[in-house]
Amino acid sequence: MSGFCVLAKYGEIAVKGRNQGWFENCLVRNLRHAVGGPVLIRRRGGFLVASAHHRDPAELTRRLQEVMGLNVVQPALSVPPTVEDATAAAVDLLRRRHAERPGAPVPTFAVRARRRWKDFPMSSDAFAAHIGARVCAELGWRVDLAAPEVPVLVEVDRREIFVSVERLPGQGGLPVGCSGRALVLLSGGYDSPVAAYRAMRRGLHCDFVHFTGAPYTDPSSMYKAYALARELGRYQTPARLYVVPVGNAQKTLATAGAEELQIVARRRLYLRIAEELARRRQRDALVTGDSLGQVASQTLSNLVSADQACTLPVLRPLIGWDKQEIITEARRIGTAEISVLRDEDCCSLLAPSEVATRTNPADLRVIEQRADIDTLVEQALEHVTVLTPGRVRGAEPPRAKVARPTVVAG
């Protein structure tokens, strides 16, 4: 008796040695969360097998494609470990695949067989040839071993055989959560959501902090940050978004004589607030969307000056990316349609006419002393709003719509 399943194949986890089991456990937890209901997960050498009878096969496959740590996601039929069952399954899969494309020319195919169970009665080549001959006889398809349009993938295990005609890319990287927890400084632009995604891909679970210009700006940037965090929730387990109003603090910095140092002084303020939030929430690092030299505030001198305002590590996954690379990645992961929406953000509030490209931390400390920076940080933290964005569900979420957030305690 055959049944639909998905082969979830990982890459980097396979070289983790004695720690591989721990990484696998983390991956299994994330797979269960991604499916969002009862799912049977079986472990095989080098991959996992996921089955969920209550799920549409295409939906199950799509959800597993969003799980970090998987290199390949392969929908398949699981059949008893006999030559006849596997051959019949291959013919059936190809027949159904062609029926879904009425009017299309008959494609070429090739069978790739692999035996993990070496006591199987046929060699891999002989098994592939046997299945191929049956396909040619029953369906009339042509064989192309060099560049087949449809590869038939057959994997022989001791207890079952997996037959597949599709091999889809996964997200790669490491399972979210296996590298620790971080707090992402999330703006409404292209850069920081992509930085969050890249951090997740290296195993970091990410919460988010967003700074608004309230009470001098409208809540549009908060709604936008909420939508971005919700979209990014497709790739990890539940996270929180902390919204911090810094309009009054920015006004204080502007009147403390910051002038062309104002933007870097703000960045130091944001890092101080984010660091204190991270410490209170037991997060291990901060993540920003900085790209070296992209704008005046992101010169090496200014990044060094900003980092000296905090002691937690500040991770910058996009430090060597150019803007077009970032936008291309944003489109791929689903955040670009939100980032392009207009909003009233804190960066546009009281913006100076010029921004220094080289700054001295000593000069910035003088400005912070005048503004009483510690008091500004405490006042901002007293007005934090905590949101739970959840995650997008469904095949094609309406990404260009910004939902109003849900506020929770804590």
Swiss-Prot record:
It catalyses: [ThiI sulfur-carrier protein]-S-sulfanyl-L-cysteine + a uridine in tRNA + 2 reduced [2Fe-2S]-[ferredoxin] + ATP + H(+) = [ThiI sulfur-carrier protein]-L-cysteine + a 4-thiouridine in tRNA + 2 oxidized [2Fe-2S]-[ferredoxin] + AMP + diphosphate; [ThiS sulfur-carrier protein]-C-terminal Gly-Gly-AMP + S-sulfanyl-L-cysteinyl-[cysteine desulfurase] + AH2 = [ThiS sulfur-carrier protein]-C-terminal-Gly-aminoethanethioate + L-cysteinyl-[cysteine desulfurase] + A + AMP + 2 H(+). It is an enzyme of class 2 (transferase). One of its GO terms (cellular component) is cytosol. CDD domains: PPase_ThiI, THUMP_ThiI. Keywords: ATP-binding, Cytoplasm, Nucleotide-binding, RNA-binding, Thiamine biosynthesis, Transferase, tRNA-binding. It comes from the Bacteria. The keyword Transferase applies. ATP binds at residues 185-186, 210-211, 267, 289, 298. SUPFAM superfamilies: Adenine nucleotide alpha hydrolases-like, THUMP domain-like. This is Probable tRNA sulfurtransferase. It comes from Nocardia farcinica (strain IFM 10152). Pfam families: ThiI, ThiI_fer, THUMP. Belongs to the ThiI family. Pathway: Cofactor biosynthesis; thiamine diphosphate biosynthesis.
